[in-house]
Regions:
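A structural micro-motif
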Residues: 4-5, 51, 78, 189
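Active-site HxH/HxHxD metal-binding segment of metal-dependent hydrolases
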Residues: 37-121, 206-210
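Conserved beta-strand hairpin/beta-sheet module of binuclear metal-dependent hydrolase folds
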Residues: 2-49, 141-153
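Conserved S/T- and glycine-rich ATP-binding loop of Class I adenylate-forming
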Residues: 22, 59, 132
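Short, glycine/acidic-enriched loop or turn micro-motifs at the edges of active sites
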Residues: 26-27, 37, 63, 138, ...
Length: 214
């Protein structure tokens, strides 16, 4: 079993976002989830021998989660992974990814378009892609079964859920995504959300006021 660890790096752009780094300590190779800001700081981290960046993963395409993507991709020459739906509907349109709202239009594309249920072999482990529409049309969570860990983006928070009043959002789809897909994971699954603190699936099933288990 690989020696894996998840680090949280909160980045400060237009709002605070939890950027996560999954590293294999046996090889020092890593991937980053949702590098939303602080491209210079992240570049410094990934220029060290203990964090060799291999890929960028996006849970969704909102501006606060993608702000450093283009700079990191250009500097390190690594691919960007996102759901096919998100790549087609959100990433390339500044009005939909909300970057134009904040006066800094961003457009980008995904090099690898992911499908629901797809499993990726990377860093000596498997990452399962779980499509969770609701916050955006192509929101995607990433489940690392070996670590009993879920990178949840803005789908599921500690005792809350993501907003659905932005373009392509849907409250009914979000609740369905959480109940049918995320709450089906083991209760001790650790949840690493895009904002706020970590939690577990079991805790959310009992205490999430916005999406009780049902």
């Amino acid at each position: 079993m690989a020696d894996l660890e998840i680090f949280r790096k909160t980045v400060y752009g237009y709002m605070d976002v939890n950027c996560y780094i999954l590293v294999n300590h046996d090889t020092n190779e890593c991937v980053v989830f949702d590098p939303g800001a602080e491209a210079e700081t992240l570049t410094e981290i990934f220029s060290t021998p203990t964090f060799v960046l291999k890929a960028i993963f996006l849970t969704h395409g909102h501006h606060d989660h993608i702000g450093a993507v283009n700079e990191l991709k250009e500097h390190f020459g690594v691919p960007v992974y996102a759901s096919k739906m998100e790549a087609e509907k959100v990433l390339g349109d500044p009005s939909v990814n909300l970057s134009s709202m904040f006066g800094n239009p961003i457009s980008m594309h995904a090099d690898e378009m992911l499908e629901d249920g797809q499993e990726l072999d990377i860093l000596g482990t498997k990452i399962k892609c779980i499509l969770t529409p609701g916050h955006t049309a192509g929101g995607m969570c990433y489940y690392i079964e070996e670590m009993q860990s879920l990178i949840a983006g803005d789908t599921l928070f500690c005792e809350s859920v993501g907003r659905t009043d932005f373009p392509t959002g849907s409250s009914s789809e979000l609740i369905r995504s959480i109940r049918d897909k995320l709450y089906a994971l083991p209760d001790d699954t650790k949840v690493f959300p895009g904002h706020m603190d970590t939690t577990t699936i079991g805790w959310e099933k009992k205490h999430n006021f916005a999406c009780p288990e049902g």
